[in-house]
Regions:
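Secretory targeting and sorting signals
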Residues: 1-30
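Short acidic-hydrophobic surface loop/beta-edge motif
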Residues: 34-38, 71, 95, 180
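Catalytic-domain carbohydrate-binding cleft regions of carbohydrate-active enzymes
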Residues: 43, 100-101, 113-119, 124-647, ...
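N-terminal low-complexity, Pro/Thr-rich disordered segments
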Residues: 23-31, 660-667
């Protein structure tokens, strides 16, 4: 069924690779198309100006825009124009088209398959700097996928309801991304590249999806043609790989990981960490680990943490393992910086390979990045981590940020994708305490790491963005997902009681809980003043942890199912209920496995509308049985209520219902 589009938020963005197309996206392709049929769909190639239109059951389900195929040479953009020849031999379609340049021709090869087609196009007569393809967003209904937005505070869901501009979309991105997009009409796009791209979704409200790649090789992509978004997702996973295992244990799924960042920010020291951990334990706020957001490479680390073994022992007595932050970034102030430079262990400067590549890190300090593709550097770095485990009682690590930076050059013979592989292999040697990785791209899905979405500020708007980011990351192939961190961070004022409680409640109905701000109190980093939370907030947070812990057997079942199928655990409603049109724009509900519909309150107030898809549902808060599809208007959700519903006909319903009743999604 055709799915309508949501409201567009307008904005502007700088240009790096791609220049926006003029005007807005048109409708169908031009007149006189050449049609190539398969049993499942038709591909129509317009001849007056090269465009591709995918038709299933007589209806357009994806189309490129007019002027969709473009290329840039130097500072000038040129369009691909009329088709001059086309032919089909077996499953291969070949198309030749003219361009704005009289001596330059485009060759396009399409390989037709039963549920997809591969597109490969390039120039003859010139070498382009970049090749760009644009799709009409409206032709396929709503768009999803991509992963995280570069603006961490905004995550449009669906993508076309807002704007995304990522001029450095690559394996080295800080954001968790993959070159995969899917649509409400059951089509999808996968761009086959490991090089940086320029990606724009609805830039300036133009209604286009623009995908630009380097022009020194053909632009290669796959278009999936299925009946539902979930089937497209499974096609994608079949190519990049489903998780081979879960790096996270059952106990780590069951209780939160507490990270010290948003609690202490720049005041990371042994005394403060212990005081925080003791307050958590005294308040009955469970967790499996206390993770210190600091690295032993800091120049003053020994002053601030004089006795790591003693810290580890005391945390163990309180019920927590000790974890430490680590990353490949090495600022000039690091104790081992000079050694890393002298040994050639850092990525190299593109303008002078004899020098390390230095750039400004988040804290304003010049820094380099350890070169994991250099075997000697990798061995040196790994040896240091093993020493921490052996000598200091560190149980695991948080591997933070990226494993490569596009401002640097790869090790000779290595690609950007190799750094993803080296990074995941390195992290796999150590217990991450389910802090997960922020690394992605094709084939990283198979590693089975927990995945943290990006830091968010501390307001309700960012809680909603965190939920949408989880859905985006989960449905590009990273099912073991969590928000970073409950209550937000980014050195903003602490969250209000209401935001902190609601965030914990939402996280209780996700695969994993990742915490920092303590409901027992926190220092406001913007004022230096201590903030005491209401005792009721402690109780609500404790209840959220209890809910998640009781759901752990059900969640663990979903983990094992995901290892078989690759399906996401936290997923949008339309994955399970593709015929319910309303579900395609719901951004504040999700399915946790097949049986649990989570509808927590994600903004101020005490009521919310809840959409229930088709089926028979048990309202956990009220005990009533409801039939969908239905919209529950002004559903009562005071601060002590986390709306949740169990699909009584779904696998796992009995186990989920028992857990939610016992823990009390109403507490």
């Amino acid at each position: 069924m055709p799915i309508g589009r949501g409201t567009v938020r307008r904005g502007s963005a700088a240009l790096i690779l791609a220049a926006p197309l003029l005007g807005t996206a048109p409708g169908a392709a031009g007149s006189g198309p050449v049609t190539f049929a398969t049993p499942g769909y038709e591909l129509r190639v317009a001849t007056d100006r090269l465009t591709l239109t995918t038709v299933r059951a007589g209806r357009t389900v994806l189309a490129t825009a007019a002027g969709a195929f473009r290329f840039r040479i130097g500072g000038d953009w040129y369009l691909v124009r009329e088709v001059t020849d086309s032919s089909r031999e077996g499953d291969t379609v070949r198309v030749t088209a003219a361009t704005d340049l009289p001596d330059v021709t485009v060759y396009l090869r399409i390989t037709l398959r039963s549920d997809r087609y591969d597109v490969n196009w390039s120039l003859s007569g010139a070498t382009a700097d970049v090749l760009s393809t644009a799709y009409d967003l409206d032709s396929a209904g709503h768009w999803y996928g991509h992963g995280e937005n570069t603006d961490q505070t905004v995550q449009p869901w669906p993508l076309d309801s807002g704007q995304l501009v990522d001029t450095a979309f690559s394996p080295a991105s800080y954001q968790v991304v993959s070159p995969f997009w899917y649509t409400a009409d059951g089509t999808g796009l996968r761009v086959d590249t490991d090089e940086p791209m320029d990606v724009r979704i609805n830039s300036g409200g133009n209604g286009l999806g623009e995908f630009t790649v380097a022009g020194d090789r053909p632009a290669a992509s796959t278009v999936f043609v299925e009946d539902t978004p979930a089937e497209v997702y499974r096609d994608h996973i079949a190519l990049v790989g489903k998780p081979e295992h879960s790096d996270t244990s059952y106990a780590q799924y069951a209780t939160p990981l507490w990270n010290s960042w948003a609690q202490l920010y720049g005041e990371q020291n042994q005394r403060n960490v212990l005081a925080w951990a003791r307050a958590l334990a005294a308040a009955g706020l469970d967790g499996h680990a206390i993770q210190v957001e600091e690295s032993v490479i800091a120049a003053d680390f020994d002053e601030r943490f004089p006795d790591l073994p003693a810290l580890s022992q005391e945390l163990k007595r309180l019920g927590f393992d000790l974890g430490m932050w680590t990353g490949l970034y090495m600022p000039e102030t690091a104790a081992d910086f000079s050694q890393a430079v002298d040994k050639g262990y850092l990525l190299k400067d593109p303008s002078d390979p004899s020098r390390p590549c230095l750039f400004t890190w988040w804290n304003g300090r010049p820094t380099g990045l350890i070169d994991l593709a250099n075997p000697a550097a990798r061995q040196w770095y790994t040896r240091g981590l093993k020493a921490q485990v052996r000598e200091s009682g560190v149980a695991g690590f948080k591997f933070d940020t990226a494993f490569f930076d596009d401002r640097c050059v790869p090790y000779p013979g290595a690609t950007r994708a190799d750094y993803v592989r080296h990074g995941t292999e390195l992290a796999g040697e150590f217990d991450q305490q389910r802090a997960g990785l922020r690394v992605a791209w094709n084939a990283a899905q198979a590693q089975g790491f927990a995945t943290r979405t990006a830091d968010k500020p501390t307001t309700f708007a960012e809680l909603r963005a965190a939920v949408s980011a989880n859905l985006a990351v989960s449905t590009i192939g990273y099912p073991f997902v969590e928000t970073d961190m409950i209550g937000g961070s980014l050195q903003y004022p602490p969250p209000t009681d209401e935001v902190l409680a609601r965030w914990a409640q939402a996280a209780s109905l996700m695969p994993l809980m990742y915490a920092s701000t303590s409901p027992t109190g926190v220092r406001d980093t913007t004022t230096g003043k201590w903030v005491d939370y209401d005792p009721g907030t402690v109780e609500l947070y404790r209840a959220a942890i209890a809910t998640h812990k009781r759901l752990a057997p059900y969640i663990w079942d979903q983990v094992r199912q995901t290892l078989k199928t690759g399906d996401p655990i936290m997923r949008p409603l339309f994955f399970d209920f593709p015929k319910d049109e309303a579900g395609y724009t719901v951004a504040d509900e999700w399915m946790l496995g097949p049986a649990v519909l989570a509808a927590p309150k994600l903004d101020e107030g005490t009521t919310r509308d809840v959409f229930l898809p088709s089926g028979v549902w048990r309202d956990v808060s009220r005990g009533s049985v409801l039939r969908g599809p239905a919209t529950l208007r002004a559903y009562a959700a005071p601060l002590g209520v986390t709306p949740a519903f169990v699909n009584l006909r779904a696998k796992g319903a009995a186990k989920a219902l028992k857990a939610l009743r016992a823990a009390g999604a109403t507490r």
